[in-house]
């Protein structure tokens, strides 16, 4: 199988420890509640259990995106080039990379409050990630000049 590498040398990644991944916000549309963000998953590190509260889509740019059920069993593997829309309030899951680092474009749609809830082992909410968190990440990118090469912006 051929390996494709996404050239991310112009991307300034922000580590979000609570989700065990790195992000770079590309654009935010306040009026429509849209957040477009690159998320980078390190190889073979399982993601945190969570549930999406809004509609979203994913496009795998590098590596593969692996999905696990709440019990840890493998649900699905999406290879490079996979585009999949997702519904709000779907099944809780975790996601992460396989043997190669994964870079995925996530487009979250139609929410200006909480967008993702992270769950503990008893399925209780342990952390919320919302529209304001992505806005803060974009503001940090702009303030530090991290967005200038890619032109990230709030609409």
Q: How should each PLM-predicted stretch be described?
A:
Residues 1-33, 119-155:
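A short, N-terminal "cap"/entry segment at the start of jelly-roll beta-barrel domains
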Residues 23-25, 36-38, 57, 83-85, ...:
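Conserved hydrophobic/aromatic beta-strand scaffold that supports enzyme active sites
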Residues 25, 33-51, 87-90:
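Conserved short histidine dyad/triad with adjacent acidic residue
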Residues 30-31, 71-91:
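Short acidic-glycine-tyrosine-enriched beta hairpin
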Residues 37-39, 47-52, 69-70, 75-76, ...:
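Short histidine-centered beta-strand/loop micro-motifs
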Residues 43, 52-71:
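Glycine- and acidic-residue-biased ligand/ion/polar-headgroup-sensing regions
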Residues 84-85, 99-116:
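A short hydrophobic beta-strand segment most commonly corresponding to one strand
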Residues 91-95, 105:
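Aromatic- and Lys/Arg-enriched surface recognition patch
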């Amino acid at each position: 199988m051929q390996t494709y590498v996404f050239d991310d040398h112009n991307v300034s990644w922000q580590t979000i420890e609570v989700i065990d991944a790195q992000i770079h916000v590309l654009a935010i549309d306040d009026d429509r509640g849209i957040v477009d963000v690159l998320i980078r998953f390190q190889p073979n590190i399982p993601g945190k259990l969570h549930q999406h509260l809004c509609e979203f889509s994913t496009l795998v740019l590098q590596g593969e995106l692996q999905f696990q059920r709440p019990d840890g069993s493998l649900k699905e593997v999406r290879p490079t080039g996979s585009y999949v829309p997702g519904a709000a309030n779907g099944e809780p899951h975790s996601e992460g990379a396989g043997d190669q680092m994964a870079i995925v474009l996530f487009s979250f749609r139609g929410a200006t409050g909480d967008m993702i809830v992270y769950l503990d082992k008893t399925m209780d909410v342990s952390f919320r990630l919302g529209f304001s968190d992505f806005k803060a990440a974009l503001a940090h990118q702009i303030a530090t000049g991290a967005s200038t090469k890619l032109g990230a912006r709030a609409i």
